UniProtKB/Swiss-Prot annotation:
Function, in words: Component of the FACT complex, a general chromatin factor that acts to reorganize nucleosomes. The FACT complex is involved in multiple processes that require DNA as a template such as mRNA elongation, DNA replication and DNA repair. During transcription elongation the FACT complex acts as a histone chaperone that both destabilizes and restores nucleosomal structure.
GO molecular function list: DNA binding; histone binding; nucleosome binding
Keywords of this entry: Chromosome, DNA damage, DNA repair, DNA replication, Nucleus, Transcription, Transcription regulation
Any GO CC annotation of this UniProt entry: chromosome, telomeric region
Subcellular locations according to the entry: Nucleus; Chromosome
GO BP of this protein: DNA repair; DNA replication-dependent chromatin assembly; DNA-templated DNA replication; nucleosome organization; pericentric heterochromatin formation; positive regulation of RNA polymerase II transcription preinitiation complex assembly; silent mating-type cassette heterochromatin formation; subtelomeric heterochromatin formation
Stretches with biased composition (Acidic residues): 477-514, 521-530
Chain intervals for the UniProt region annotation (Disordered): 458-542
Coiled-coil ranges (or none): none
Family membership noted in the UniProt record: Belongs to the SSRP1 family.
Assembly behavior: Forms a stable heterodimer with SPT16. The SPT16-POB3 dimer weakly associates with multiple molecules of NHP6 to form the FACT complex.
Note: In contrast to the orthologous protein in animals and plants, this protein does not contain a HMG box DNA-binding domain. This function may instead be provided by the HMG box of the associated NHP6 protein in the FACT complex of fungi.
Protein name, as recorded: FACT complex subunit POB3
Amino acid sequence: MSTDFDRIYYNQSKVSGRFRLGEGGLGWKASATGGSAAMQNNEPILLTADELASVQWSRGCRGYELKINTKNKGVVQLDGFSQEDFTLLKNDLQRRFNVQLEHKDHSLRGWNWGTTDLTRNELIFSLNGKPTFEIPYSHISNTNLTSKNEVALEFDLQKDGYNPAGDELVEMRLYVPGVVTQEDRHSSPAEDADVDMEKDNKEEKSIAEAFYEELRAKAEIGEVSGDAIISFQDVFFTTPRGRYDIDIYKNSIRLRGKTYEYKLQHRQIQRIFSLPKADDIHHLMVLSIEPPLRQGQTTYPYLVLQFQKDEETEVQLNVEDDEFERLYKDKLKKQYDAKTHVVLSHVLKGLTDTRVVVPGEYKSKHEQCAVSCSFKANEGHLYPLDNAFMFLTKPTLYIPFQDVSSVNISRAGQATTSSRTFDLEVVLRSNRGSTTFANISKEEQQILESFLKSKNVRVKNEEKETQQRLQTALGSDSEDEDVNMGSAAEDDESVDEDFQAESEDDDVAEEFDSDAGVSESETEAADGADTEDRPSKKAKLA
């Protein structure tokens, strides 16, 4: 008769289920909640008796946890037991499978240093003999030796059905100090007899490097290079910058560089672009990755590869004929002899089932598929594709036309030093801001405007609108001049100036002239006198 436990969580899942101990083994099946058809179709998790290597009991997230180390299926964690279940489980495991249930207490000191133990299925970090935390190898997607004494662990977030409950740990770094001395195995017995030569034949190796190599072997991180379907050697990447060997497997891709290695699943590749570079020497390939690759705090949502335009590759797939006929006949070719970027594009298209985007109908003034421009302080090229803008190479920007509210053209035609260039401002929908590409040659303006209008993208030319507003304003001003300017000019000449001059003379005379109080008749008589006296009078006043 079996023993059942309800409300048990498998491998920290968000859905509980039923755990059962039977004569032939044990199993877990999720409980169907809310009539969910997806839950009802879930297959049970089964473990036979001969798969059990060891079983441990410890505190868990939802009560007490049963951790099962298997021989071939990694670590199985079952959480949600009560403290009273320990005796029943211990007796059942002993009676049915002859397996001892070991009680493990965790260290709760909170110290960030201790010792590591690489066991069959997991990495255990311990303090004073008590485990602080455990990391199953199945959760580690990649590891890198980031410095002489530091090892980085990257965790796998790409599993099928992965559904995080909230914030997730994506990377951990371990500081591993110290060195270990290794003897040179190629040394001869005569050299070993000599003490000085023996010292020379000993090599120092950091403990971090030894830990890194052992972890890679234990966790089986990355497939063996010889198992790759196809490989490309020494490919130059502009993002992340460096040269990498590309090993393409059935479901994943591994980039092996001098310092770092990256692993991505085929399903992470959202888009593939194959674009000629404007220098007519190189060809670019861009992979859009979601979620992006990570290196510390840096994320890489786009991988940019650069090839010589005429570089060719002759390669054969590393698969058996029957496997090729069964899996790859309709997707790949058995043998390739073509340009390198064409071969890689075809292979990625076949394995990821993703369309390769190439330049569309747009041609610049110089018959190229891109225009030179700058984004902030970075110079690059803007590719007007059939459905989007793309800026290369750094940073890589992709703006679909469906996200564009309007395109504003400014600085075109101004009588300044910048009159030979214009700016292209791409305004996004839903008030998501704008992106400006500056210093585009004015020769490209008309061609670019026509292309965008053909794609039903709203284009606004600020210079044309400004000129139209100015002409409208000047037109209204000229009409006002025909009505009012004549009388205004006449008033200025016949009234205002004479009155102003006359009043000024009177004021000066009253203030400085001793004869300023003469009668009006005397003034008229003086006006009829010789005009030569008036300049001398003004000179006297001055």
